[in-house]
């Protein structure tokens, strides 16, 4: 993918079309959770914690396998204007439910739940500050928090084998001003003609592709270009995950 001056200067951030936002993972961010990570993707900041619960949902009792699930939420002032807490409204929005199910599915895709035993790994992803890509940052950070929780279980002797089979990470891609771009911030996300969230494993397999035309359509060729950008971006994110765990 070209990184010419034209490619760079036309993005609000000045990034090349194939460039991620500045990205970091800060492990051990909170004291009590078995795993905790503050993930920063540009101005999107998400706190991901992993809690080990010595129980499983009723549908898994007695089956000798575990469960990985997730919850997602945004602080009231994570965005430009204050939003009410969903607890105060008495119910979760459809968006929240969709995102937390996506996070759970993405993590379960790389777990051998039989090796986890009859326990639950509960991931909480709380958006401290949102500037686009919160669900993708949540998945990428939650995997590191989960890895730390599993490492603690193995250190304690509660697990004989590591149930994590592969890494998993996610990134957004989209069409902005007729071009495919990687890792959209809020300004780009608000103006894009297509928005695609891509979840992949460290070995390069797809877990999920969520793509939507935003008042427009996109071609197979444009989708292929966006997926190519996503593959490159996720490879970088997986490297960052593995480096953070060293």
Swiss-Prot record:
Which domain of life does the UniProt lineage start with? Bacteria
Which UniProt key words apply to this protein?
Nucleotidyltransferase, RNA-binding, rRNA processing, Transferase, tRNA processing, tRNA-binding
Cell cycle as UniProt keyword: no
Q: Which GO terms describe its biological process?
A: rRNA catabolic process; rRNA processing; tRNA processing
For this protein, the record's InterPro entries field holds: ExoRNase_PH_dom1, ExoRNase_PH_dom2, ExoRNase_PH_dom2_sf, PNPase/RNase_PH_dom_sf, Ribosomal_Su5_D2-typ_SF, RNase_PH, RNase_PH_bac-type, RNase_PH_CS
| Top-level EC class | transferase
Enzyme Commission number(s): 2.7.7.56
Any one Gene Ontology molecular-function term assigned to this protein's record: 3'-5'-RNA exonuclease activity
- Catalytic activity line of the entry: tRNA(n+1) + phosphate = tRNA(n) + a ribonucleoside 5'-diphosphate
Q: Does the keyword Membrane apply?
A: no
Q: CDD domains attached here? A: RNase_PH_bact (cd11362)
Q: Which residues hold phosphate?
A: 95, 133-135
Q: Which family does it belong to?
A: Belongs to the RNase PH family.
**Subunit structure of this chain's protein:** Homohexameric ring arranged as a trimer of dimers.
Q: HAMAP family, alphabetically?
A: RNase_PH (MF_00564)
Main function? Phosphorolytic 3'-5' exoribonuclease that plays an important role in tRNA 3'-end maturation. Removes nucleotide residues following the 3'-CCA terminus of tRNAs; can also add nucleotides to the ends of RNA molecules by using nucleoside diphosphates as substrates, but this may not be physiologically important. Probably plays a role in initiation of 16S rRNA degradation (leading to ribosome degradation) during starvation.
This one is known as Ribonuclease PH
Q: Which gene encodes it?
A: rph
């Amino acid at each position: 993918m070209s990184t010419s001056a034209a490619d760079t200067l036309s993005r609000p951030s000045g990034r090349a079309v194939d460039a991620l936002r500045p990205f970091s993972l800060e492990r051990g961010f909170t004291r009590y959770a078995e795993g905790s990570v503050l993930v920063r993707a540009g101005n999107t900041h998400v706190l991901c914690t992993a809690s080990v619960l010595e129980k499983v949902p009723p549908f898994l009792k007695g089956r000798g396998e575990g469960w990985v699930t997730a919850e997602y939420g945004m602080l009231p002032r994570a965005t430009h204007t204050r939003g009410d807490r969903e607890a105060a409204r008495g119910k979760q929005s459809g968006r929240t439910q969709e995102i937390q199910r996506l996070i759970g599915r993405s993590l379960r895709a790389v777990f051998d739940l039989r090796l986890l035993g009859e326990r639950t790994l509960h991931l909480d992803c709380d958006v401290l500050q949102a500037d686009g890509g919160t669900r993708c940052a949540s998945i990428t950070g939650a995997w590191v928090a989960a890895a730390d929780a599993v490492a603690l279980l193995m250190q304690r002797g509660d697990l004989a084998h590591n149930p994590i089979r592969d890494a998993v990470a996610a990134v957004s891609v989209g069409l902005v001003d007729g071009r495919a771009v990687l890792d959209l911030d809020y300004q780009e996300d608000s103006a894009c003609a297509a928005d695609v969230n891509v979840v992949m494993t460290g070995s390069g397999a797809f877990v999920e592709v969520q793509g939507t035309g935003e008042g427009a359509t996109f071609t197979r060729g444009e989708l292929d270009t966006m997926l190519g950008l996503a593959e490159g971006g996720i490879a970088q994110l997986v490297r960052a995950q593995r480096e953070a765990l060293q």
